[in-house]
Amino acid sequence: DRDSCVDKSRCAKYGYYQECQDCCKKAGHSGGTCMFFKCKCA
């Protein structure tokens, strides 16, 4: 589901979201970004 990475991957304060992107890609999304320290899959 679209927000399955929110709890699994933490988002750093300053734009580092590789963990979020990797999680989203594994879940079948094109990637992910961080919004308010939460991982959102794109």
UniProtKB/Swiss-Prot annotation:
InterPro entries: Ergtoxin, Scorpion_toxin-like_sf. Coiled coil: none annotated. One of its GO terms (cellular component) is extracellular region. Expressed by the venom gland. GO terms for molecular function: potassium channel inhibitor activity; toxin activity. Disulfide bonds join C5-C23, C11-C34, C20-C39, C24-C41. It comes from the Eukaryota. It is found in: Secreted. Keywords: Disulfide bond, Ion channel impairing toxin, Knottin, Neurotoxin, Potassium channel impairing toxin, Secreted, Toxin, Voltage-gated potassium channel impairing toxin. Signal peptide: none annotated. Blocks Kv11/ERG potassium channels. The presence of a 'disulfide through disulfide knot' structurally defines this protein as a knottin. Has the CSalpha/beta fold, which comprises one or two short alpha helices connected to anti-parallel beta-sheets stabilized by three or four disulfide bonds. Belongs to the ergtoxin family. Gamma-KTx 1 subfamily. This is Potassium channel toxin gamma-KTx 1.6.
